[in-house]
Swiss-Prot record:
Job description of the protein: Together with its co-chaperonin GroES, plays an essential role in assisting protein folding. The GroEL-GroES system forms a nano-cage that allows encapsulation of the non-native substrate proteins and provides a physical environment optimized to promote and accelerate protein folding.
InterPro entries named in the record: Chaperonin_Cpn60_CS, Cpn60/GroEL, Cpn60/GroEL/TCP-1, GroEL-like_apical_dom_sf, GROEL-like_equatorial_sf, TCP-1-like_intermed_sf
Binding site for ATP: 30-33, 51, 87-91, 415, 495
Subunit organization: Forms a cylinder of 14 subunits composed of two heptameric rings stacked back-to-back. Interacts with the co-chaperonin GroES.
GO annotation, biological process: protein refolding
Alphabetically ordered keywords of this record: ATP-binding, Chaperone, Cytoplasm, Isomerase, Nucleotide-binding
Pfam families: Cpn60_TCP1 (PF00118)
Places the protein is found: Cytoplasm
This protein's record includes keyword Nucleotide-binding: yes
Gene behind the chain: groEL
GO cellular component: cytoplasm
Reaction catalysis annotation: ATP + H2O + a folded polypeptide = ADP + phosphate + an unfolded polypeptide
Protein name per its UniProtKB record: Chaperonin GroEL
Amino acid sequence: MSAKEVLFGNDARVKMLAGVNVLANAVKVTLGPKGRNVVLDKSFGAPLITKDGVSVAKEIELEDKFENMGAQMVKEVASKANDAAGDGTTTATVLAQSIVTEGLKAVAAGMNPMDLKRGIDKAVIAAVAELKNLSQECSDTKAIAQVGTISANSDETIGEIIATAMERVGKEGVITVEEGQALENELDVVEGMQFDRGYLSPYFINKPETGSVELETPFILLVDKKVSNIRELLPILEGLAKTGKPLLIVAEDVEGEALATLVVNNMRGIVKVAAVKAPGFGDRRKAMLQDIAILTGGTVIAEEIGLELEKATLEDLGTAKRVVITKDDTTIIDGTGEETQIKARVAQIKIQAEESTSDYDKEKLQERMAKLAGGVAVIKVGAATEVEMKEKKARVEDALHATRAAVEEGVVAGGGVALVRVASKIGEVEVINEDQKHGVVIALRAMEAPLRQIATNAGEEGSVVANNVKNGTGNYGYNAGNDTYGDMLEMGILDPTKVTRSALQFASSIAGLMITTEAMVGEIPQDAAGAPDMGGMGGMGGMGGMGGMM
């Protein structure tokens, strides 16, 4: 085991604070509408230009191991805020820096670190409760667009495209962000339920110009097994022939005689039919078949629940307004399932997603939920260069997380105003001694730090702006984008409550741990000079004689 170096008391705290300041100073320049860019060096390719706090934080590693410990702890603040709400990483870093700086000053002056931490914790609990009181519901498209715009550093096009996507696929719908091919951002929406299974035979195609199968108001047969014997399908096909409606078969597989007979019947125009494989594998396939059944108002024909294909009737079939099948995908549009059952199924899947510990399972469950709830939207980010593309894509992802958080917990006045109002409304927090009281003061002072930093980045004097805002009431605040004061909600400057709450909670949690740190232990680096030399290689000098080998 290698030797360790240990720092105690003030020596440890000074080093730790130095690391906190290096990371926080690099991150906080990105805050607000007039925040600056940070350029990140990459080992290969062009450097990355970003205004995303967590991206900057992740790149920072310091040479001094004790300073690096401080930096890594603040990096954890940004990371946790990003995981919880997807945004607010810079705000969390600014809050943490303020609490740590003031807290360590108080410790150096002889105050009890544990009481300071208790005071900070009490203030934050009161602040979170007050934030919930200030929060307003965010449900209309305009408010969603405003939240997206603010999070994307005042880029209105990003806010609008996210609001449109949410309007099209619903609050539970899946919205993904991809790199586009054009210069402008594009929105691609797949409405209805789409799964990645295409037609089993090209002979089912009835739209040769697009190479697809289109079925209008079809019946949908769902079978949880392989179908190879046509006799099993005869009762259904005979019933269908009388209705004159088309049929979509979704089964584990359709093969051999069954597939050949369906193709022949389809080509002769006796029955309009198409067959696709069921999506997924194993238990996931069973679950997705059940999803389709609920969406279309049908029943999954499965032998394990005592249903046989030969005995199936038209009542067991689902229906939809339209089905489109390409060689890769099947889309069921406007299934005729009962709305109450669909909502119950979505709620059930949502619970499973929340309880799941696997990121992959969570993602798949959210996809299923979206397909039932409305559809999938893809935002294709457009840019002129690869460097701009990466920067813009990161902003779109941030804005998307922020709008989801806003829909979930509501919004408060943006621009750091909500925290200033919360600090003024908390009033007297119950404490048992002067040190705890000072801890409360530290937390309340830190709540002004984001507003001060936004003003500083806009070229204004932070303390002057903070005083002007404190003298106002309600949503009155400073719009750094155009250097004016007014009602933040009316100006469309909104922050998701969840983002502000998460930033405050994570910042105070990690900062509290740093204030109560009394010793730091780091590894002493191995001295490279101490390694054994490569003795004995000197004899290689005789190799000079190899010249005669030529």
